């Protein structure tokens, strides 16, 4: 018997092959259309989504504002008979009501072994019986969510350690399953080889490597969260993570008679353009309503502030970045502003639509104002300046921001002050000066800085903000502001 397993993760609501500006070779409809044809070649199939499914695109932003009985994204996955779902950290961004609306009707398919208090019932694992060959799928979500998420969005929830929870269920799984799959919205914190050398701070955000080090009962780890792209074997365990936004997906084939296992990441850009009509019809009305919403003009500039080269914009500044800083400063009243320019940033034409805003700022981040000393501000700027390196006389990007996962979003620019960094100097000694209104910023004086809730809370990236007093919270999405 041949069983095919398909895994998607971090789709972020990308259904159509578009980023809502240009056509792109990605998205659920292309993946699903392939699966519908491909699964006919096998005796049985198993379809698993590993989270960050219903947040992260213009479509999901639109859906979060609507009163809907059934989330069309979930409806689409159900149309091709997905068997199991894992919750991702971004599933909580729009609050528990949105989460419940999306998953309540399919809660019997949600596998969750480490979140307590969800507004719907889930099971820690499911066992799928294929003519006596039993595959167990246990679901986990990164425990690091409380470090990012607004408290109101995870009220009364408890996030339990992944490794401890697997240990709790391991005996049951071994007794009842021939093949154990960990379905994990989290990634690998160490190198993808037998050495397992740490590649990031060991914060428990990602515990895939820790699972491999502690258990020999796992046959496969289907991961997500990090937006990496790989499929490999570590300690004889298949480990996979498909690219985000539906750019690739995992395919594994198990032959129960020969015990042969084949595996691959399927590159969606190499699939044909055929999309199943019945699947597409599920989204037809939603797409029409979305396009009307996205095309609404909401503002106008005297001239365009388009971003042609995002690297140069990060390096030298740009009117678009200045505008974002001014928005944060105006709405907060803070002395300074810190923000990341997202990879999707394209800037604005003279006329601004809802589409333009959501392309440039796709995340539902809110703002916080912190008290910082001039010394803490300098520490934050020094950290950000490690993004740049000089190699062979040319300015480039520090590999720590590129591997093991791309992290351009961890480079911040700063507004409300004039500052200069010298890239020829060593890390953490690059700030030449910091001035506000023409005067040097005092290292001892207390100022205020506005930044998004993610940066304010996740101080492992910018430790300068650790312990800083929160003086104001602006609980409105930046895209709405």
Language-model region placement:
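Acidic, metal/ion-coordinating pockets
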Residues: 1-272, 315-327, 337, 472-476
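Feature captures C-terminal
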Residues: 2, 14, 26-30, 106-113, ...
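A structural detector for beta-sheet-dominated domains
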Residues: 6, 255-257, 264-269, 306-308, ...
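Acidic/histidine-rich, surface-exposed loop or edge segments in extracytoplasmic proteins
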Residues: 7, 12-17, 301-309, 462-466
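Short, glycine-/Ser/Thr-/acidic-enriched flexible segments
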Residues: 54, 117, 142-143, 187-188, ...
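Conserved strand-to-helix beginnings and helix N-cap segments that scaffold or border functional pockets
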Residues: 96-97, 276, 462
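Generic alpha-helical structural element
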Residues: 200, 290, 313, 317, ...
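A short C-terminal boundary segment appended to hydrolase-like catalytic domains
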Residues: 256-352, 457
């Amino acid at each position: 018997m041949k069983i095919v397993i398909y895994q998607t993760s971090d789709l972020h609501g990308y259904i159509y092959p578009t980023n809502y500006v240009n056509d792109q070779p990605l998205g659920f409809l292309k993946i699903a259309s392939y699966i519908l044809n491909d699964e006919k070649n096998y005796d049985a199939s198993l379809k698993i989504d590993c989270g960050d499914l219903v947040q992260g695109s213009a479509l999901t932003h639109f859906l979060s504002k609507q009163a809907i009985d059934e989330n069309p994204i979930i409806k689409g996955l159900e149309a091709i008979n997905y068997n199991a779902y894992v919750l991702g950290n971004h599933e909580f961004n729009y609050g528990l009501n949105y989460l419940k609306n999306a998953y309540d009707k399919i809660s019997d398919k949600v596998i969750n072994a480490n979140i307590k208090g969800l507004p719907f019932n889930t099971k820690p694992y499911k066992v799928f019986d294929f003519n006596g060959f039993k595959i167990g799928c246990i679901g986990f979500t990164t425990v690091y969510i409380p470090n990012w998420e607004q408290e109101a969005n995870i009220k009364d929830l408890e996030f339990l350690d992944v490794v401890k929870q697997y240990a709790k269920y391991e005996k049951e799984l071994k007794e009842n399953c021939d093949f154990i799959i960990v379905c994990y919205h989290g990634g690998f914190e160490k190198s993808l080889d037998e050495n397992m050398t740490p590649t990031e701070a060991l914060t428990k955000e990602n515990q895939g490597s820790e699972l491999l080090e502690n258990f020999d009962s796992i046959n496969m780890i289907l991961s997500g969260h990090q937006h990496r792209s790989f499929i490999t074997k570590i300690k004889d365990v298949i480990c996979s993570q498909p690219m985000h936004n539906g750019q690739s997906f995992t395919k594994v084939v198990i032959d129960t008679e020969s015990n042969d296992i084949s595996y691959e990441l399927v590159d969606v850009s190499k699939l044909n353009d055929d999309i199943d009509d019945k699947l597409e019809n599920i989204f037809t009305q939603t797409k029409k309503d979305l396009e009307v919403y996205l095309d609404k003009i909401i503002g106008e500039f005297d001239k365009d502030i388009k971003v042609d080269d995002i690297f140069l914009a990060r390096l030298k500044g740009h009117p678009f970045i200045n505008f974002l800083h001014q928005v944060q400063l105006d709405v907060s009243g803070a002395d300074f502003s810190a923000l990341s320019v997202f990879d999707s940033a394209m800037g604005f034409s003279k006329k601004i639509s809802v589409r333009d805003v959501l392309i440039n700022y796709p995340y539902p981040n809110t703002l916080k104002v912190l008290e910082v000393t001039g010394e803490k501000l300098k520490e934050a700027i020094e950290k950000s300046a490690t993004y740049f390196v000089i190699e062979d006389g040319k300015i480039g990007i520090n590999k720590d921001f590129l591997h093991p996962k791309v992290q351009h979003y961890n480079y911040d620019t700063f507004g409300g002050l004039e500052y200069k960094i010298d890239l020829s100097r060593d890390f953490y000694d690059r700030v030449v000066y910091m001035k506000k209104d023409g005067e040097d910023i005092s290292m001892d004086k207390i100022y205020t800085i506005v930044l998004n809730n993610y940066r304010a809370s996740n101080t492992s990236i910018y430790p300068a903000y650790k312990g800083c007093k929160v003086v104001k919270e602006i609980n409105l999405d930046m895209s709405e502001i």
